[in-house]
Amino acid sequence: MIIEPRMRGFICLTAHPAGCEQNVKNQIEYIKSKGAIAGAKKVLVIGASTGFGLASRITSAFGSDAATIGVFFEKPPVEGKTASPGWYNSAAFEKEAHKAGLYAKSINGDAFSNEIKRETLDLIKADLGQVDLVIYSLASPVRTNPNTGVTHRSVLKPIGQTFTNKTVDFHTGNVSEVSIAPANEEDIENTVAVMGGEDWAMWIDALKNENLLAEGATTIAYSYIGPELTEAVYRKGTIGRAKDHLEATAFTITDTLKSLGGKAYVSVNKALVTQASSAIPVIPLYISLLYKIMKEEGIHEGCIEQIQRLFQDRLYNGSEVPVDEKGRIRIDDWEMREDVQAKVAALWKEATTETLPSIGDLAGYRNDFLNLFGFEFAGVDYKADTNEVVNIESIK
């Protein structure tokens, strides 16, 4: 079929298999171009199919020749209907990894559930024996706690008072004002239950209890802080509470891993265009201004550049892992530079529907958004008849 982007709000309903494959190949080429990383050799990636999780899997495999197991929850294709992009990304990753002689297997299902944990533990036991790196990179709006059976839904709200600020509809370029009513206590609890560190700790406990973590094993989860501009809706809002919980969980997990000489880290990453960030009011406008400045300064990074730098310069740099006063790894350091943030804040005041095309990088934002779904890649013939039914080699 001929596959084109079909939009509904912040979501693209279609994905292009050849474009997703090109995206994965581009990331692999980038990693190969940067040279070997003395990293982990057996890696479990929970949330492995898009964004930072996919970039972590690619960096491990093609930077360190690691065997990887990827867990994700994606929609497979059916005739006449495309898969979700993460399915095509994972199919392409496995194809390339197997071609390179690397072990790569994937599990598709709800990583929050006991069943998928069980399946993953059994696969590690059978094929790898143990893992020495666990990446936790889940992005989901809903979680059913396997122990209580309660389904929690996260919300994106400020805490304390209504938040009003500018936002942009990145499809139309229309800058408008948005108001978000504050969260109640239940909203906060639900968001922490979904996006906090509870499930990360459950995974590590399960792996450790069955002796599936190697001596000196490391685990890492991803967080975001961001500037004052977004903090009311992000870091000081419901999501921020969840991130606080995630960051606190790193210390609990480090205690759990003491007997193995292992460690848990949270890496604070930069703002990027993802399906999740596109749905957050204020963030798309912030990102389009940030991109403009970081590109001008020559310090712009996408997911793969961020994770390559995280592995090469922080995690596997041959000495101590540099952290901030709260024990976090900071690869948002270039975004949060004072000069960069001062420029963004100045542009923010000027941003209107009329000025944004010249002061921001809305085109870059749109391009990155379409890239998430496999569109707008050079070297892909989007007019060609494309087979939407693509299989992942390890998923039968």
UniProtKB/Swiss-Prot annotation:
The gene is fabV. One of its GO terms (biological process) is fatty acid biosynthetic process. Substrate binds at residue 224. It catalyses: a 2,3-saturated acyl-[ACP] + NAD(+) = a (2E)-enoyl-[ACP] + NADH + H(+). GO terms for molecular function: enoyl-[acyl-carrier-protein] reductase (NADH) activity; NAD binding; trans-2-enoyl-CoA reductase (NADH) activity. Involved in the final reduction of the elongation cycle of fatty acid synthesis (FAS II). Catalyzes the reduction of a carbon-carbon double bond in an enoyl moiety that is covalently linked to an acyl carrier protein (ACP). Keywords: Fatty acid biosynthesis, Fatty acid metabolism, Lipid biosynthesis, Lipid metabolism, NAD, Oxidoreductase. It comes from Flavobacterium johnsoniae (strain ATCC 17061 / DSM 2064 / JCM 8514 / BCRC 14874 / CCUG 350202 / NBRC 14942 / NCIMB 11054 / UW101). This is Enoyl-[acyl-carrier-protein] reductase [NADH]. NAD(+) binds at residues 47-52, 73-74, 110-111, 138-139, 243, 272-274. PANTHER family: ENOYL-[ACYL-CARRIER-PROTEIN] REDUCTASE [NADH]. Belongs to the TER reductase family. Its EC number is 1.3.1.9. Pathway: Lipid metabolism; fatty acid biosynthesis. Monomer. The record marks 74 as: Plays an important role in discriminating NADH against NADPH. The active site is at 234 (proton donor). Coiled coil: none annotated. It comes from the Bacteria. It is an enzyme of class 1 (oxidoreductase).
